[in-house]
């Protein structure tokens, strides 16, 4: 990724509303959890990668990922942001918009090739389970990044207990040593869980 003067930059075509620095788009950590992750904890492997992004919304973060990736499969189920996502995909040929519910990955299975990176950004009670269902697309050794909004999972348990619960679920599903990464500096109440998919570990279960 491209960094200049502490700014994360993106080399793609400038879109309306983008801030620009030295002719490149500024990837704002306050507007994108992926950018926040890069600023606080390091870069995920996005360059020339095949990425599946769950919860793409109107495609702001997806557009930045597409500047670096080979292809981004962008799943969104809300009609209004999907319209913006489709317009974006017309201008960026390596974005494939999928108007689907990420809880049912079998519905878009024919359209998604194996990916190097799976990003889950859906704030629902079953957000960890949604990530696990979509592991069918992730290559051996591929990376999973799950953005957790813990309040969306209910208030009946402590934050720490929720995180332990999610980590245990991911490990049981084949994610190796998931790291819990705080994003509060830019996104209050959000946590990232980042791990690597190991089929052999899954089989051991």
Swiss-Prot record:
Q: What class of enzyme is it?
A: transferase
Coiled-coil ranges per the record?
none
Q: Which biological process terms from the Gene Ontology are attached to this UniProt entry?
A: box C/D sno(s)RNA 3'-end processing; tRNA processing
The residues that hold S-adenosyl-L-methionine are: 60-61, 76-77, 101-102, 121-124
Q: Which cysteines are joined by disulfide bonds?
A: none
Task: Tell me its EC number(s), please.
Answer: 2.1.1.-
What SMART domains does its record include?
Answer: Fibrillarin
Q: Which Gene3D superfamilies match?
A: Vaccinia Virus protein VP39
UniProt-listed CDD domains: AdoMet_MTases
Q: Which domain of life is it from?
A: Archaea
**Keywords recorded for this protein, A-Z:** Methyltransferase, RNA-binding, rRNA processing, Transferase, tRNA processing
A GO molecular-function annotation = histone H2AQ104 methyltransferase activity
Any single Pfam family the record assigns to this protein: Fibrillarin
Listed SUPFAM superfamilies:
S-adenosyl-L-methionine-dependent methyltransferases
Give the UniProt family note: Belongs to the methyltransferase superfamily. Fibrillarin family.
Q: What does this protein do?
A: Involved in pre-rRNA and tRNA processing. Utilizes the methyl donor S-adenosyl-L-methionine to catalyze the site-specific 2'-hydroxyl methylation of ribose moieties in rRNA and tRNA. Site specificity is provided by a guide RNA that base pairs with the substrate. Methylation occurs at a characteristic distance from the sequence involved in base pairing with the guide RNA.
Tell me how this protein assembles.
Interacts with nop5. Component of box C/D small ribonucleoprotein (sRNP) particles that contain rpl7ae, FlpA and nop5, plus a guide RNA.
Tell me which NCBIfam families the record gives. Answer: PRK04266.1-2 (NF003276)
* The protein's name in its UniProt record: Fibrillarin-like rRNA/tRNA 2'-O-methyltransferase
According to its UniProt entry, this protein's organism is Methanospirillum hungatei JF-1 (strain ATCC 27890 / DSM 864 / NBRC 100397 / JF-1)
* Gene from which this protein is expressed: flpA
């Amino acid at each position: 990724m491209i960094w200049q003067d502490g700014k994360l930059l993106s080399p793609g075509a400038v879109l309306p509303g983008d801030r620009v620095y030295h002719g490149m788009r500024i990837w704002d950590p306050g507007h994108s959890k992926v950018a926040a992750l890069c600023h606080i904890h390091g870069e995920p492997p996005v360059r020339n990668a095949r990425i599946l992004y769950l919860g793409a919304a109107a495609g702001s973060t997806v557009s930045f990922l597409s500047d670096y990736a080979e292809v981004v499969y962008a799943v969104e189920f809300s009609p209004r942001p999907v319209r913006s996502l489709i317009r974006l995909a017309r201008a960026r040929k390596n974005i494939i918009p999928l108007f689907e519910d990420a809880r049912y990955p079998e519905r878009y299975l024919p359209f998604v090739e194996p990916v190097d990176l799976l990003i889950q950004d859906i704030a629902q009670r079953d957000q960890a389970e949604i990530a696990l269902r979509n592991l069918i697309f992730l290559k051996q050794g591929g990376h999973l990044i799950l953005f957790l909004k813990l309040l969306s999972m209910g208030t009946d348990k402590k934050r720490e207990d929720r995180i332990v619960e999610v980590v245990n679920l991911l490990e049981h599903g084949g994610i190796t040593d998931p790291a819990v990464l705080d994003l509060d500096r830019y996104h209050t109440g959000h946590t990232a869980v980042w791990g690597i998919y190991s089929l052999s570990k899954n089989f051991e279960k």
